[in-house]
Curated annotation (Swiss-Prot):
UniProt-annotated binding residues for ATP: K144
Any one of the GO BP annotations: nucleotide metabolic process
Lineage, opening ranks: Eukaryota, Fungi, Dikarya, Ascomycota, Pezizomycotina
Cofactor(s) it depends on: Mg(2+)
SUPFAM superfamilies: HAD-like
Highest taxon in the source lineage: Eukaryota
Stated family: Belongs to the ISN1 family.
Originating species: Aspergillus fumigatus (strain ATCC MYA-4609 / CBS 101355 / FGSC A1100 / Af293)
Ways its activity is controlled: Allosterically activated by ATP. ATP binding is a prerequisite to magnesium and substrate binding. ATP binds to 2 of the subunits in the homotetramer inducing a closure of these 2 subunits and the release of the C-terminal loop, thereby activating the enzyme.
Keyword rRNA processing applies: no
InterPro entries the UniProt entry points to: HAD-like_sf (IPR036412), ISN1 (IPR009453)
Gene: isn1
Positions of IMP binding: D184, D186, D192, T220, D373, K381
Name this polypeptide is given: IMP-specific 5'-nucleotidase 1
Length: 450
């Protein structure tokens, strides 16, 4: 069992770039590297890399089975830590069992979030919107990725990231169900800077979700004020929904586009030549967003623009400044490629500058690395996802899934979505398609089981 191992969270931080996965919950930042450290112990003890075996020998099969068991135990222990820390969907235990030692303490529910073992091991862990069946998720991914059979390559960052995604899907399917799926645009649904074309493999999967009655939101950083611009980027999906004979008008109405992170909402409209109609802000603004006044918005963007110009000059970046209604950013005017380190430096400088301003302390904003540009938007994707939830009648975070590719703390705009919903961290359109296929597979399995 993993209780044999001495877990030192502080020493588990790698000396290189520090990756963190945002699961579901308020301020939940669960360290993938921490889980990686836990799995490193059985890998070192049981992998047998120097043994001279035939690759299909009985000895190797036995080693793989033993390693699988050890990995599964670790994921089960972490799953129990999360249940102990925060189990929002679990019914209260019968009074007769309330004092039994094996029951979850459920510190979040009992107003003692800082006292859980998970909080002691991972101080940044917050509350969770759903359960995470990590042991079952690992067994699912192990069957696909053969993690336990590897003798020279330890469980990787991507192995754990995809296992967490699977656990999140299992938690939704087995728990409250799914009413809303929101997607990032670039990288998640199409290549960076590209468009959603008619042959995109995600389209039939999204239509399948709409057919199930699941609402769909495209929550993108692209801050256009006209539907025509979004039609250019999302034409393949919008035309497919328009032409679909299997979708009812009500199901088609379940598609919206939130632009500028959280600033412009468009609903699907079959009668519009651009398949989209602008939704006036009073129909979807959250109460907190109504206090964002134009004077503060202008002041924050002025500070951000000044910081962007200063940083571009300091780093000698070949960029132009683009000021929009609710955003400001820099992009290469000669289409040259800017180094990632320069983009991240710009993000952090601007973010720090705006955060230290008076207006930055009262007005939400998001500074992010767009791949070859840097932008600052008013609001962020947590507000965008929450606005979609409100527009569709008040969908709960526990019944919402946000799919995106940017979940690093610095310069990543999907990072904040974890405050409003459960999340899945993908790295490409291919992974998005695989995730949606996994979801369908799990839904069918759960239906057959019930």
């Amino acid at each position: 069992m993993t209780t044999r191992y001495r877990v030192e969270f502080a020493s588990s931080r790698p000396t290189g770039k520090f990756f963190t996965a945002r699961l579901n919950g308020q301020t939940n930042i669960f360290q993938i590297e921490w889980i990686k450290g836990l799995l490193a112990v059985p890998f070192v003890l049981h992998s047998q890399p120097t043994a001279v075996y035939q690759e299909h020998s009985e000895n190797l099969v036995a080693v793989a089975a033993d390693t699988h068991q050890r990995y599964a135990e670790i994921f089960r222990d972490v799953e129990k830590l999360i249940d102990d820390h925060s189990r929002p969907l679990a019914p209260p235990p019968p009074p007769v069992l309330a004092s039994h030692l094996t029951l979850s303490v459920d510190h979040e529910r009992n107003a003692a979030p800082g006292k859980s073992k998970l909080k002691l091991l991972v101080p940044t862990a917050g509350s969770f919107f759903s359960r995470l069946p990590l042991e079952d998720a690992f067994k699912y991914q192990d069957a696909k990725r053969m993690i336990s059979r590897r003798r020279f390559v330890a469980p990787s960052f991507n192995d754990i990231r995809l296992t967490l995604n699977t656990a999140q899907l299992l938690g939704l399917v087995r728990g409250p169900g799914l009413d809303l799926v929101t997607f990032d645009g670039d990288v998640t649904l199409y290549d960076d800077g590209a468009c959603l074309t008619p042959d995109n493999p995600a389209i039939p999967r999204i239509i399948r979700l709409l057919h199930q009655g699941v609402r769909i939101g495209i929550v993108t950083a692209a801050g256009y004020t006209e539907g025509a611009k979004y039609y250019e980027r999302l034409k393949g999906l919008l035309d497919a929904v328009h032409d679909s004979s299997s979708l009812t008008p009500a199901q088609k109405d379940g598609l919206v586009v939130m632009g500028g992170e959280s600033n412009f909402l468009f609903r699907f409209d079959s009668a519009s030549p651009h398949r989209l109609s602008y939704v006036p802000r009073p129909e979807w603004l959250l109460d907190e967003m109504k206090s964002w006044n134009q004077e503060d918005i202008t002041q924050l963007l002025d500070i951000a623009e000044s910081s962007l110009r200063a940083c571009a000059a300091n780093l000698n970046l070949p960029v132009a400044v683009l000021r929009k209604d609710r955003a400001v950013g820099v992009y290469p005017y000669d289409r040259s490629k800017i180094h990632r380190e320069q983009l991240e430096e710009t993000v952090l400088v601007v973010q720090n500058t705006v955060e230290r301003s008076v207006v930055g302390s009262r007005l939400p904003f998001c500074a992010f690395n767009g791949g070859n540009d840097v932008f600052v938007d008013i609001g962020d994707k947590s507000w965008g996802v929450r606005a979609c939830q409100r527009y569709f009648g008040g969908i709960e975070p526990s019944r919402t899934l946000h799919v995106g590719d940017q979940f690093l703390s610095a310069g990543a705009n999907d990072f904040k979505a974890r405050l409003a919903s459960t999340t899945a961290w993908i790295a490409s359109l291919t992974e998005t398609v695989q995730l949606l296929d996994e979801l369908e597979e799990m839904q069918k399995a759960e239906k057959n089981r019930s």
